[in-house]
Amino acid sequence: MFSDSGYRVFQTPIVSRNGQTISLDARVETWTGVRALAIVPFEKNFDIGLLEPGTYTLNFKSWDTTVKQIQFAIVATPPAAQPIDGACFFVTQHYRDFLSREADGAGFAFWTNNLANCGMDASCLEVGRINVSAAFLLSIEFKETGYYLYRMYRGTLGRRPTYAEFVPETAELGKNVVVASNDPWRIRLSSNKDIYTSQFFNRPEFQARYSGLTNAQYVDKLFETEGVTPTQAERDEIVDSLDHCAFTIGCPTRVSVLRRIIEHPAFERRVFNEAFVTLQYFGYLRRDPDAAGFQFWLNKLNRFNGNFVDAEMVKAFITSEEYRRRFP
């Protein structure tokens, strides 16, 4: 309060309070001359008690005369929001959970701006968060990695992938892939899928089911496992391509045929709903779906003909206690 070294406090300050007014009487006097050089500045804390929310006046006094007055406010602090409630954290976490990577600058700005445009409108934010979240689930990048992996397991081994299998393998499928108009991402993605498909083809679990089969048996068994019936012409064309083009550069192989059949549009449509449910558990809850929960959401999604908005699926997952507990 007194910046000049020619003052000293010679009496312990007295603190008093009257309602919203707090006074500190410090009893200051002039102090000059050689002895003033011995004065050492110090700080002292004063207990003014617990203050309720409101506006207060703090008076600094000397000899009962107010020399300075400060007004301040105590504001009630709401419970701290969880990190996932913030737009930046929400978007960043979706990149990690669904695309297995950090956000790229353009994508991050686009999605956070979508939420920022809502301002403080709670209903707008609720809908916006659902739409942003669903966009990741349905993004080209996730469809070409997460859904492709799901179909690989489901269409060849007749089972869903586990969460432990899904996480590292999806990361490999999406390695160095960022979907952007000015980036040759399709080339990298196709290369990643070729590598992954070849590795999957050589796994013991796959070979136990498909090794030793003729080309025709191999193709028929893949379609049978998928639950898809191709046209006779389509089936025969695939078999003939294997029979008459083996070991020739540019000709189909069992690996390339595997990828072709896994990407069959009829199979994609057939398993989309079950994949959507499974990948929500993997992405949001970071675990395998429990049987009851999986069947409940699959039945509901089927009842709404695949309309996840009307089924309120994304909303249910991102507002669930289990999801929010991930971000204390």
What is the role of each PLM region?
Residues M1-P78:
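Exposed, flexible binding/inhibitory loops of compact, secreted disulfide-stabilized domains
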Residues P78-P328:
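Composition-driven recognition of low-complexity segments enriched
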